[in-house]
Structures are given as C-alpha cells and as structure tokens.
Curated annotation (Swiss-Prot):
Function: Plays a role in virus cell tropism, and may be required for efficient virus replication in macrophages.
UniProt-listed GO biological process terms: taxis
Coiled-coil stretches noted in the UniProt entry, renumbered to this chain: none
Designated name of the protein: Protein MGF 360-16R
Keywords: Early protein
Keyword Methyltransferase included in the entry's annotation: no
Induction: Expressed in the early phase of the viral replicative cycle.
Membership in a protein family: Belongs to the asfivirus MGF 360 family.
Species of origin: African swine fever virus (isolate Tick/South Africa/Pretoriuskop Pr4/1996)
Length: 352
C-alpha cells in the first residue's frame, strides 16, 4: 500500500507549476539534477511516464518509471531510487545495474532479488526476445556501461549477439568494445523488427549510431531509412551495395544503391558469391551482364546447372524503369511485389 506521502508526491507531480514554485518542489523531493537534467519531476497523466523540466526527455512521452529508476540507480541518487520504486518502478531492474555495494543494499531493502549467476545474461536475452519497444530500451539502459559484463566470456557473448541480430555487428571479434557492440545490438534488433519508438530513442541516445543505422537499413531492405541515413552519412555506393547484397530478396536496397551509381555487375557477382540467387537475377533485370565471370564463379561453387544457364544468350536487360532520383516511395511502389522477369525467361526457354 502506498504511503500518504507517496500519494501526495504523485498528486503534486501530475500538475504543472510556475517557476516560483520550484523551490517548494526541490524541498518536496520532486527535482532531478545531474549533468544533463535540472528541473522538476512530472508524471504524464496519460501514460504515467516521467518527464523532467519543461520538455520530455525522450520521444513524445518522457521515459517510463523503469527507465527513470535505472538511471537514478546508476547516478546513485538514493532519494529518487526510493521515490520511483514507491511509484511503481521495478526495483529488480535497478539491482541489475547497481554499481556500488551501498546501492545494491538499497535495492535489496526495497524488495529487489539479489542478482546471481546467469541472471544477467538471462535478462539480456529476455529483453531482446520479447521484441517490444519498452524491453529493448530497458535492456539498453540496464547494460550500457554495466561493469558486471566484464566478467562474462566476451567472445561467446559477441558471437551470440551477432547471431541474434542477424547483421554483422563488427568486422572482427576483437575490433569493437563491448559497450559499442551492445549499442549496435539493441539498435539492430529494433530496426529488424521495426520497433519505431525504440529506434527513435536509440537515435537520440546512442552517439555516432548513424553509420550503423545505414548498414541496418541496407541489410533489412528499408529504402525510407536508407534515404534518411544518407542525409548525414557519406558512404561509397559500392560499399552500400555490398551490404545490400548480403541478404537475399533485398531488391529495394539494391535498387537504391544502383540509382546512386553502384556497379550493378559487381552486385551481380557479390549476390552469387553470397549465394543469394534472387538478388543475382534482380541485378540481371537491372542490366547486369557479367555472365562470363558469374559462370566461372558458379562453376567454382559447383553450381553446374546455373553455370550452364548463365552461358545461354537469352537474357533481357534493363527491364525495370529507372527512377530519376532515389525516391523511397517510388522504389517501394515499383518493387514491393516484384516478379523476377529473367527467371520467367529461363522457364519459358525450357518449356518451349
């Protein structure tokens, strides 16, 4: 049951006050001051999220009680930890990121289960498996700069995260710090499952994420996010095409890179190298004609039937009308239900 003082603080925090009331709010414990915040604590009447100062911290509706509690624990702000716990924040999340013995004891005194053994890894996996915005954000906040992960097998953790994210999070296992790896992991999971609130949150809270956001957009075939990322990220079109070809059926990503000037013959060969034949046929529809090189590569990969087909002089090229500019709306309309035309040509040839 909530205490009378807790209920009173909640009632006060749901209202907006003028600056002349700020000294009273500070005395009342409804003030948050740190390196980035300095303002009154408010509760949104509609979603029960926490806001600080004149404007929300994140997106349109502030931050959840759990996120506020996690941040207060990391800042070792004991009064706010107690306040947010009394208001309904999950103190177990706080215990997972408590960075001092005194803060750990406070969390346990407020009802947290002492974290032990695999609980940290199990929680990390749970947050990424539930596939909703709030859990991805909670996972990011709990494990960002969390020293407990210094004790885990880093190579095993990096491999596991890369497999779950589906997209390569790093070039080599030793080339990226764990903090950056985890940031990329949460972002990739959000993009992969189109969790727009989490994407917006990470865009605003993870520094220098834009280059990786472009890689995600290319890999997961999202022309709108590609278009947005290209406004701030300068990447060579052929490098972009290489990323796009790493996932099959990435027609919209490949077409966007093609319009930027990427080499479509190289895209055809890269698609075959990765074993993504739908991408290869799409490149042929766009005008790729590296049939001799592709035939040699198919032979090396022991694809004898494909090698023979690529040697036939039956293919039509430039079957897709080019857009004047890489407009994601036009690209999506043009390719959403695209049928590979030269695959039909092959079937027609053999059915004659």
């Amino acid at each position: 049951m909530l205490s009378l003082q807790t209920i009173a603080k909640m009632a006060v925090a749901t209202n907006t006050y003028s600056k002349c009331h700020y000294p009273i709010l500070k005395v009342f414990g409804l003030w948050w001051k740190n390196n980035t915040l300095n303002g009154p604590i408010k509760i949104c009447n509609h979603c029960n999220n926490i806001m600080v100062g004149e404007y929300p911290m994140c997106y349109n509706h502030g931050m959840s009680l759990d996120i506020a509690l996690i941040r207060a624990v990391k800042e070792r702000n004991m009064s706010l930890v107690q306040l947010f716990t009394e208001w309904g924040g999950n103190i177990d999340y706080g215990a997972l990121c408590a960075n001092t013995p005194s803060m750990q004891r406070l969390c346990e005194s407020l009802g947290a289960k002492p974290p032990k053994g695999r609980m940290y890894m199990d929680t990390l996996i749970h947050f990424s498996d539930t596939l909703n915005d709030n859990d991805l954000i909670r996972g990011y906040e709990i494990f960002d700069d969390n020293s407990v992960l210094d004790c885990v097998n880093l190579i095993r953790l990096k491999i596991m995260l890369t497999l779950k994210a589906r997209i390569s999070l790093m070039e080599q296992l030793d080339q990226i710090a764990l903090k950056q790896l985890l940031q990329r992991y949460w972002y990739a999971m959000a993009v992969q499952h189109n969790l727009t609130i989490a994407i917006h949150y990470f865009d605003n809270h993870i520094p220098n994420i834009k280059p990786f956001s472009l890689r995600c957009a290319l890999y997961f075939n999202d022309p709108f996010k590609i278009h947005d990322a290209c406004r701030t990220v300068n990447m060579d079109p052929n490098e972009m095409m290489n990323i796009a070809c790493q996932q099959d059926l990435n027609f919209q990503s490949i077409y966007y890179c093609y319009l930027l000037g990427a080499d479509i013959n190289q895209a055809m060969l890269m698609s075959l190298k990765y074993g993504h034949l739908s991408n290869m046929w799409f490149c042929i529809d766009l005008g790729a004609d590296a049939f001799k090189e592709a035939g040699v590569l198919a032979g090396k990969k022991n694809r004898r039937v494909l090698q023979y087909i690529l040697g036939l002089n039956i293919f039509k090229r430039e079957l897709i009308p080019p857009c004047k500019d890489p407009d994601p709306y036009q690209i999506q309309i043009l390719l959403k239900n695209y049928i590979l035309k030269n695959v039909s040509t092959v079937f027609t040839y053999y059915c004659q």
